[in-house]
C-alpha cells in the first residue's frame, strides 16, 4: 500500500466522481485552530455551548467568605475556545442536510466514540455534538497524526488539507452493510460489515446479495476508481438498491472483517466458501457472513469505551473533566 493509495481514499477525492451513488454530503475545510483544539487532550470541555449563569450566592454575610467562594469557583472553571465563523458554516451545512448529520474527517468517522453520546449514536445536530465525538475518538486522532503509518513507500508524505465531512443522517440497518475488496480491478471478496451479529436474511439471500453487489461494481466502480486495488463499503436497502458508502485503502489500515489480509493479498482462490453454482463463475467473489448465533462476537469498538479522560477520573487525577462532561450532558438534555 502506497501513500497515494491512502490519499485517493480521502472523501473529497472520490465524492465528486461518485456523488450520484452515495449519500448527500457537505465538505468544509477544517481551520488550523479547530484542528489544534481537537488534538488538545488536556481537557474534555467542548466549545459551542454557553453554561447558564450562576443564580445563587452563599447565604453567609461574611464578605471574606463570599470572596473566597468566588475565587474558588473562578479557578475551577475551564473555558472552551469558540469558533463563531466555523460554527456558523457548520450549522448552515447541517440545516441544508435536514438538521442531522453523520460526521467524519478525510478518512474516518468517530465510530469508536459512539458510547459517549447521549443516545449512543453518531447522529449530530450541532458543532458541539461533533466536537464531543471527535475529541473522544482514536480513529480521528489517527487521521490527524498517522494517516500513512502502514504505507511501504519512502516518498514524502502528501500535503493533507483536513476537512470536516457532514453526511445527511440516514437510519441504516447494520445487517444491510457490506465491505467489498477489489484487487487489480477485480471484486475478490465481500464481507458482512457488522460481523459481530448473526442476520438470518443474509444467510438466506447471500447469493442474491452477492450478484447485486457484483452488478453495482461492474456498472459503476470497475476501472473508474483512482486505483486498481481498493476497498469499498455499500448499503443495500429494502428495495435491493445499492448505495456507495465509502472507499478505503487496500491494506492493513482497513479492517478485513471476516477475511484476513494474508488471504486477500495471496494468490490463493478465496471462493471456497460459496456455493458450487457460484464457484463455476470465474468472476464470482468470495462471500462471507456470520453463519450462526454461535459465532457472534463482541463489538470491536468495545475496547475503545474507556478513554484516558475517564481513567484520570478513576484515579482522581482530573476532576475538572467530570465537571465539564456533566455540564455538557446537562446542556444536551436541555436542548432535547
Curated annotation (Swiss-Prot):
Residues recorded with modification Phosphoserine: 60
Phenotype upon changing residue 109 to V: In 3Y1tsD123 cell line; reversibly arrested in G1 phase of cell cycle at the restrictive temperature of 39.8 degrees Celsius; due to extensive degradation by the proteasome
Listed Acidic residues bias regions: 60-73
MF terms in GO: ATP binding; magnesium ion binding; protein folding chaperone
Gene Ontology BP term (one): eukaryotic translation initiation factor 2 complex assembly
Tissue specificity of this protein: Frequently detected in granular vesicles, in the cytoplasm of some epithelial, stromal and sperm cells and in varicosities lining nervous fibers, while it appears to be absent in endothelial and smooth muscle cells (at protein level). Widely expressed. Expressed at high level in testis.
Binding of ATP, residues: 104, 107, 109, 111, 167-170, 177, 179, 193, 233, 246, 248
Alphabetized InterPro entries for the sequence: CDC123
PTM field: Phosphorylated.
GO cellular component: cytoplasm
Database matches in PANTHER family: CELL DIVISION CYCLE PROTEIN 123 HOMOLOG (PTHR15323:SF6), D123 PROTEIN (PTHR15323)
Protein name: Translation initiation factor eIF2 assembly protein
Protein source organism: Rattus norvegicus (Rat)
